[in-house]
């Protein structure tokens, strides 16, 4: 198998891994609020838009490195009244949890691939 074929195969595997387990939801307290019922619900559905991979010259843990570009549909609301937002509108800790889930899933199945995420 040529290096290009290996990269194409990894591209397909990354897409399958991310796109298969691609939903998250939860709620967060509104900033600067001390009321226990002042919160927002959120839900996110994401899919891979593009994968950019290359073989690492010298590697200890990562044989392949790259970036995964993600399209994310973000909905924020309260009691079922949803509005569409972008990933940057979520609190940073929620975005971090989403990134961690995606990266953990990739690392679990492809430990020799080290990628970062970019949300479109």
Residue spans for each PLM region:
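Acidic, low-complexity, intrinsically disordered interaction modules
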Residues: 27-112
